């Protein structure tokens, strides 16, 4: 029996937002360090025989000294526990320059049984009769000489590992990772013509089997598995049914492979159902946004807690520039102070959609309004007016807001005079 820990897409050194922890480290960067440390502790606890890392150990080809030292220390923890490490270079570990060396190569420490490869093709006998075939990402498509040499070894168990995209036989489309430079497609023949016992891949950040109909099991019998990323990089990474962390593979004495999904805690993320603002007032939109924000707050209210601060997004659809300018942004911001990142992207309603029969009648009802209704009159007018059509959309909201402020100041002067 052989126990293998399958890791990939650690992305050590990934940063986002400007929040720092008490040590002065970017909070999202620290999230990655915590996740890797937990994974290493799990691997040691489960007494795995080896660790396979299918690329993207680092998030960038120029990681910081802190990032390098942290990852080195984690790999050395494994080595101290008698667990060899086999890592290959992914697209984030490298750049586009042929002469440059993959950043992950600095981790190579064969005397400690830490093998971090950037070579085109390497084979390790990781246990008696078990061979690990490793193909790194660097200059992948230029490896015309290497490709014919990639072959399984008859009479042994053969595991193939590399970093890249494949064609999903169920979806009949290339699997893709957002915000991913130098993405390559693994040749189909390389996966099918070598009778691999199992294929353990990296690059796609959602864990699971290629061609799976249920997202949880190998329904298509491909024996091709992506471990997914160690942490979720905001909304660029999709939710994952199998969670994120590492995968424990056990090879039985009969050569069978069984998997156990291991997860590590993730920072909470909330992507709320978009609010359709077409039939709502600015006040109603504001209330809905705040209601959703409050649902993500800790018991203490809108208090920022670095370890658990959520990432939150609320999309607003079919809103007009005037209505968006009238949102109570101060109240919304006050209820978002607990978040690590808060985003409220909006899509504007087109003028043609907005000119309904009801809006055409608004002007007929404006005569005789009191001064107290001036802002309401302005908001109604701006929603069905063509006045702003000649202004670019990115400027329209700013112009509308400033005009509304001007009307408000005039209204306040009139009311004070009355």
Which residue ranges define each predicted feature?
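N-terminal active-site segment of His-dependent metallophosphoesterases
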Residues: 1-69, 390, 394-404, 411-418
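Glycine-rich phosphate-binding loop signature in dinucleotide/nucleotide-binding domains
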Residues: 43-47, 152-155, 303-307
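His/Asp/Glu-rich metal-coordinating catalytic cores
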Residues: 50, 61-225, 229-235, 250
């Amino acid at each position: 029996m052989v126990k293998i820990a399958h890791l990939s897409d650690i992305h050590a050194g990934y940063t986002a937002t400007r929040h720092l922890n008490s040590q002065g480290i970017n909070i999202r960067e620290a999230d990655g360090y915590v996740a890797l440390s937990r994974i290493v502790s799990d691997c040691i606890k489960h007494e795995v025989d080896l660790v396979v890392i299918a690329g993207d150990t680092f998030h960038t080809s120029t990681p910081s000294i802190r990032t390098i030292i942290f990852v080195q220390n984690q790999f050395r923890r494994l080595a101290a526990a008698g667990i060899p490490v086999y890592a290959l270079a992914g697209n984030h570990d490298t750049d586009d320059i042929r002469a440059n060396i993959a950043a992950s190569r600095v981790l190579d420490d064969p005397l400690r049984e830490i093998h971090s490869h950037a070579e085109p093709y390497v084979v390790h006998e990781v246990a008696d009769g078990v061979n690990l075939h490793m193909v790194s990402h660097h200059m992948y498509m230029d490896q015309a000489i290497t490709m014919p040499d990639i072959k399984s070894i008859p009479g042994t168990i053969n595991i193939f590992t590399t970093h890249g995209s494949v064609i999903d036989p169920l979806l009949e489309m290339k699997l893709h990772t957002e915000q991913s430079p130098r993405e390559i497609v693994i040749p189909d023949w390389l996966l099918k013509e070598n009778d691999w016992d199992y294929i353990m891949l990296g690059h796609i950040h959602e864990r699971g089997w290629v061609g799976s109909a249920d997202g949880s099991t190998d329904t298509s019998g491909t024996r091709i598995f992506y471990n997914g990323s160690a942490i979720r990089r905001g909304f660029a990474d999709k939710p994952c049914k199998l969670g994120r962390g590492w995968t424990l593979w056990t090879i039985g004495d009969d050569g069978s492979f069984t998997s156990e999904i291991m997860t590590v805690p993730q920072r909470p993320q909330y992507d709320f159902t978009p609010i359709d603002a077409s039939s709502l007032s600015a006040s109603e939109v504001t209330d809905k946004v705040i209601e959703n924000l409050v649902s993500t707050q800790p018991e203490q209210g809108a208090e920022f807690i670095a370890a658990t601060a959520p990432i939150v997004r609320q999309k607003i659809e079919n809103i007009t520039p005037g209505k968006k300018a009238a949102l109570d942004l101060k109240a919304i911001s006050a209820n978002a102070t607990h978040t690590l990142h808060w985003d409220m992207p909006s899509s504007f309603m087109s003028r043609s959609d907005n000119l309904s029969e009801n809006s055409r009648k608004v002007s007929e009802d404006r005569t005789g309004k009191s001064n107290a209704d001036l802002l309401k009159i302005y908001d109604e007018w701006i929603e069905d007016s063509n006045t702003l059509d000649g202004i670019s959309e990115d400027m329209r909201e700013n112009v509308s807001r400033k005009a509304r402020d001007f009307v408000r100041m005039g209204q306040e002067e009139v009311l004070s005079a009355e």
